[in-house]
Amino acid sequence: MWKGIDVSDNQGKIDWSQVAAAGVQFAILRSVRRSGKADYQFAANLAGCRKYIIPVAVYKYTYATTEAQAQEEARQVIDLLQQRGMAAGTMVWWDVEDRNTLQALGRAKLTALIQAARTVIEAAGYRFGIYVGLYVYNEGWFDFNQFAAAPLWVARYYNNYNVMQFDTDPDQNKKPEVGRALWGWQYTSTGRVPGINGNADLDICYQDPAGMEETGTELGSIWCLSIADVWAESIAKAAAAAYPGCLVHKAAVLDVGGIEIWIASIADVWTQAQAEEAQRQFAALGVTGVVHNIRVIE
């Protein structure tokens, strides 16, 4: 059993060093908003997870009422993951819970919409899972049997919305029963975690979350696509300023003997394959970069 969190820009700016020190073992990040734009804190949250080697997946809260909308939502998620160099095989959780838009669609139609999103996500090489509140299962909003092979993450809050500290384990006797094995249980929306101001959703995972996205070749390391390997922080920042989302790191470059330099990274990723794919994609846009395996110092 592993303990983690799911977060969005509702939590504001998160101190991931404190989150990691608190023992958080995985994080599930909101990917795109209803507008189709990235969650305002997605880039910062992903960078924090990567820096502190917290396995990460993403979720999308769906509002789709037609198959075309479901497919478009799925493509928006894929575009974001690819822009951020997230590996094929990363888990995408399809969040099916909006009573106002989804329940009235009926069982058959909602089932078809979820299938439409699943097809797009899996065709892009990502894994697909379903998140629901227990009430969605109990009320039979869609045909769960059609998704028997998909991981299932279920919310059930048993503590009357009282504050729960992250280091307090939930009562396993209150785990939701859905007639099949659960990937995870979201057990409160009023959790408190060091490094996060206010409430956060707390989760239990019953399968090793390390496979949600791969890690670097050495404990504490990541791969990156660097557009500037320099000695001075100011030069790295100047290079990074030309590219939205480009991050500046002081890092030990493990693939060249651990030399410590400043890097302007246009893609922080878990694997060499991801970094090389980012290199190809940016090269097609006329942006050249060097792939490195690094340990971030600051």
List PLM regions with ranges:
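Hydrophobic anchor at the start of a short beta-strand
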Residues: 56, 127-129, 152, 245-246, ...
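Catalytic domains of cell-wall/extracellular-matrix polysaccharide-remodeling enzymes
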Residues: 89-171
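Functionally critical loop-and-helix segments that line ligand-binding/catalytic clefts
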Residues: 1-17, 144-218
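Acidic/polar low-complexity segments and flexible, solvent-exposed patches
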Residues: 216-298
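Anion (oxyanion) recognition and catalysis
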Residues: 50, 122, 178, 242, ...
